[in-house]
Amino acid sequence: MISLTEDKRMLGYEALAPYPDISCFVTTRHGGCSVGNYASFNCTPYTGDDTECVRKNQEALRAALPAYPQELIIPFQTHSTDSLVIDETYQHATCSERHSMLQGIDALITDMPGYCICISTADCIPILLYDKQHRVVAAVHAGWRGTVNRLSLIHI
């Protein structure tokens, strides 16, 4: 892991550093405004954290990235094997439709530039995939259920 920010709030993967057309990172708990159980850099809106703190943390994350993404796409993960392809259908959906599309999703896949696909992990494994020929990225949340159900093989 390499630090992408001076305050070490974002870490990167050396193995993916040679691909300048993608940004790949892990956030830490440091550098945000959330308090209590969510202290301090919580960017996930599904935790019960204060909505304004989550918004500020997400804005700080977007500002810290090499290219400002038009959207952080954060699914409501349920330790399933369900995935969502972020494509024109998602892009043209209403906010309410997007929220519904992201329910129960544990893997995001896209070839659309400008979107930041996100997964949340604690004791689970983040699997980040990149197909440089087709310029497709995937972010897979692999908990024990996903591992048992071969979630990573489904998406490779």
Regions found by a protein language model. Give the residues of each.
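Active-site microenvironment for binding and transforming phosphate-containing groups
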Residues: 1-154
